Amino acid sequence: MDYGYERLQDGNKYLSETVDTDMRNTYSAGIDFSWQATPTSKLFVNSSVNLLAGPGVTATETQVYQGTTTLDGILRARNDYVEQKTLRYSNSLNYLYRPSEKHQLSITADWTRFDGTARCEQPNTYYSATNMLVRSDFFYSQPDKDIDIYALLADYKYKPNDESEWLTGAKTSFIRSHNTFLFEKNGAIDTQRSNTFHYDEGNIEGYTQYTHTLGKLELSAGLRLEYMHTSSKLNAYSSQDGEEHSDSHLRLFPNLSISYALNEQSKVALLYSRRQDKPRYEDLNPFEYLLDELSYWKGNPFLKPQISNKLILSYVWNSLSLNLSYSKLDDYFTSITDALGTTKTVMTTKNIGAQQQVGLEGLFSKRLTPWWDFSANLGLYYFVNKLDYETYKEEYKRPSCLMSVSNSILLPLGLNLELSGRYHSKHQGGSYEVIRPNGSLDIGLSRMWADDRLRLSLLMTDIFHTDRWDNYGHKGALDLTTWFGSESRKVILRLSYSLGKQKFNKVESSLGELDRL
């Protein structure tokens, strides 16, 4: 992939281009086991392992200007990831007890282990405007991450009749993250950048949900009570006394939905939900990852969860559905690029304020003929990002449009043609940046044999190579334009054969902690 930026910082221009080559491979294996001890009870066991490993290289050249036209020097940097490895073990045990149609009890225990390590060698070489060597530095970084996630869930479902259903449950989870980061410059340990970071998180939740149907009216209401405690300790090589931080809070998260069937073809519904989104563990690690000496990424151990409130009014008529929505994020966090001094930039995930969104979405899906399935989606949105953090306060807002179309066409000889496209207009990004228009077009052919167990498919994604992530923005003394293009245009040939039972009736449990890895 290739990416780069042009920035104007305190009146000076920086032009940077990077070629990123990722040579990692993914390996995975898993096993599922089901045992029905009695007609009313079942035991499910799942275990899997996933390994992502291999080298990688980035080559970056940054031109440094005095003002906007006079070239002052060139910085050439190379990130040589001589080792990259992430290993994830997931284990789950589920017991399901269903003595009758009215009662069901489910108990689930989960343990996930995540091990990540990398070794990166990075020479940074400075040249003059006439390409004469000025100086050279050699950086070395070695992050090691160990994360354990333990969770226990219990759900009880009671259905006294066909019109009513109760669901109540409890969940507890514990996360332990131990991280070390070694950073060297020219063979000597940088005691300001090298550190160890410990993070512990405990969660206790209790929840209940009631659903009742009364003729054409359906009502569902729920409440979740969550207690969260976090503690972290950051120890730098240069300090004997670590920096400690802890936080605890107790919060309520209600949800409510009311729907009414106007007739057999149409229905109207109103939905409200409140939830919290917790930061990724990677974003909490205060490690520094250098693109070069002028630009780098850094974690933030002081991130707080963001709180989401969302209201949706929906209408369904035959194959058409319309949704009018409003959402607000408080303590909103996202990755943001800030100026560091007068010559550097740092990208960090921060709680930057609030985000509001109003949206109108339309979805149409229908089998137009016995051989043609068609669906289309159109969304109109208005984003408002209210940045209010540290000493910066500003508001960014912009409308946008998102369109997508999908076709599935049955051809002679049992072939199936799939053609889909997507377009996203210019829109507001996560903070102050504006994303330029982008889109893609995909096409694929497939055929199935042996009672649909054997499948052969040929797919080409992003035919015109237009699925890019280019943006621009302004914040204080920083004007930033960035571009990003990945290997989105691919030709993929897949051959698959399904063995054994096609449907595994396991009770799925929601473990949001895993989504933060």
Please state what every model-predicted region is.
Residues 229-234, 264-310, 324-344, 463-476:
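Surface-exposed extracellular loop regions of Gram-negative outer-membrane beta-barrel proteins
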Residues 1-12, 56-74, 118-126, 132-133, ...:
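Outer-membrane beta-barrel translocator domains and adjoining extracellular loop/strand segments
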Residues 28-30, 34-52, 80-235, 261, ...:
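Face-selective signature of the C-terminal outer-membrane beta-barrel domain
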Residues 149-153, 194, 203, 304, ...:
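Outer membrane beta-barrel strand-and-loop segments of large Gram-negative receptors
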Residues 449-517:
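C-terminal beta-signal and adjacent terminal beta-strands/loops
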